[in-house]
């Protein structure tokens, strides 16, 4: 693939943003709530400050659904997870835009926060990336005002029921990137990302912001690596840290998820989905759509924007329909807060959310909420669900297919 590299593209986007140039449905007893005043309705009990007061233990997260085990013969709900890499609030206010959209459609999402988005550039000497010079980063540091705005968004998002995961720090891709890191180096990167989030008050000097209302070391149960690279050596560290899932697989199919790393980590890959007008499929992420539409050029032919926007939206909807009308495999869509090709991919995601939300049995959830549901199920049922291929409906219908548990000889869920 030629054109602008993903690393250069994300660096340019974040740097421009730092300068200010860039600008569900519920079913049964699973009601994904993101409602109310994020600052007023959160928790009645007093917050217990942690460390320097950057974070606080405020109790159970609001707006969390109760995971119920499927009844024999019951059709699974259609889970859809929208996740966001980086999760910084720049002048384009995309973080706040999609919080609003989520609230309008009773959706929870996962925001993979880049740790250095809470670290001022004046303090970049505190970041010691593996195999790179002190303070180095392939993405730009945010301006102080954008760090301030990002912290506000992270606080509000969590109080609305969204998940805060990690996108790590420096976003190093390619031959000298994270694919070369050892498990020990991944641990260093994770510890630094966590420290930047839990010590933002010390590092920024901000005194007008409330603490993030969660213990990040407990909140953090998964992430997505830069450019979907380096998963093999991340997984041992993730398992040691007690993480529940990883979303860094370089690509998967629309089947029910299983576990990796000896059955300790749920594997949630981006998925190959139909690409309208083509015989091949595309990975369910904005960057991959752009790579195929404008050869990874974020300033492609403006005359094509309307057609590309519709194609991106229809690709997401085709992926959704394939799962919804067949095996009901959870559908994963990944994105960045970006304005590539005039912002068409943000519009495409918004349009997809709006249309998906009109369907029955749809639950737009975070990865954390999906983990909780999966772990509430009969393992035999999950094994049986994993025997269904992309686009394959259960023989005889759901009542017959899940009327009895899978036999031990069925495909294992791990």
Residue spans of the language-model regions?
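Sec-exported extracytoplasmic/periplasmic mature domains
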Residues: 103-107, 159, 195-202, 239, ...
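C-terminal domain-boundary segment and adjacent tail
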Residues: 53-56, 60-64, 74, 110, ...
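N-terminal export signals
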Residues: 2, 8-27
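Active-site beta->alpha N-cap acidic-glycine motif
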Residues: 50-163, 170-174, 203-236, 252-253, ...
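C-terminal region of N-terminal signal peptides and the immediate post-cleavage residues
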Residues: 21-40
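Generic structural signal for well-ordered alpha-helices
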Residues: 95, 99, 150-155, 187-197, ...
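Active-site-adjacent pocket scaffolds in enzyme catalytic domains
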Residues: 36, 40-55, 128-144, 209-327, ...
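Active-site cleft segment of glycoside hydrolase catalytic domains centered on the general acid/base Glu
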Residues: 175-192
């Amino acid at each position: 693939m030629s054109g602008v590299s993903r690393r250069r593209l994300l660096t340019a986007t974040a740097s421009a943003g730092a300068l200010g140039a860039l600008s569900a449905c519920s079913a049964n007893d699973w009601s994904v709530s993101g409602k109310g005043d994020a600052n007023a309705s959160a928790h009645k009990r007093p917050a217990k400050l942690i460390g320097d007061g950057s974070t606080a233990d405020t109790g159970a997260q609001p707006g969390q659904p109760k995971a119920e085990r499927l009844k024999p013969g019951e059709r699974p709900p259609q889970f859809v997870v929208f996740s966001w890499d980086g999760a910084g609030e720049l002048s384009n206010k995309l973080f706040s835009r999609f919080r609003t959209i989520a609230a309008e459609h009773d959706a929870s999402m996962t925001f993979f926060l880049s740790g250095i988005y809470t670290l001022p550039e004046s303090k970049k000497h505190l970041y010691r990336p593996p195999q790179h010079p002190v303070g180095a980063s392939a993405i730009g540091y945010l301006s102080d005002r954008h760090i301030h705005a990002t912290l506000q968004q992270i606080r509000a998002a969590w109080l609305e029921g969204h998940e805060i995961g990690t996108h790590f720090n420096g976003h190093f891709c390619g031959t000298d990137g994270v694919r070369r890191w050892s498990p020990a180096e991944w641990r260093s990167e994770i510890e630094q990302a966590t420290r930047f989030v839990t010590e933002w008050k010390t590092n920024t000097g901000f005194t007008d912001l409330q603490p993030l209302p969660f213990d990040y070391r407990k909140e953090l149960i998964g992430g997505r690596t830069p450019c979907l690279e380096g998963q093999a050596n991340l997984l041992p560290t993730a398992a040691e840290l007690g993480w529940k899932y990883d979303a860094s697989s370089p690509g998967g199919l629309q089947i029910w998820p299983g576990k990796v790393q000896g059955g300790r980590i749920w594997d949630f890959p981006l998925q190959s989905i139909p690409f309208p007008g083509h015989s091949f499929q595309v990975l369910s992420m904005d960057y991959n759509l752009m790579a195929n539409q404008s050869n990874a050029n974020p300033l492609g032919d403006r005359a094509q924007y309307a057609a590309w926007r519709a194609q991106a939206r229809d690709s997401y909807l085709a992926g959704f329909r394939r799962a919804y009308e067949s095996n009901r495999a959870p559908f994963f869509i990944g994105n960045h807060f970006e304005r590539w090709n005039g912002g068409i991919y943000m519009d495409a995601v918004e349009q997809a959310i709006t249309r998906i939300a009109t369907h029955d049995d749809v639950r737009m959830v975070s990865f954390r909420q999906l983990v909780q549901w999966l772990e509430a199920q009969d393992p035999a049922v999950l094994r049986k669900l994993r025997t269904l291929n992309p686009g394959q409906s259960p023989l005889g219908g759901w009542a017959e297919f899940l009327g009895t548990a899978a036999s031990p000889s069925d495909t294992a869920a791990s």
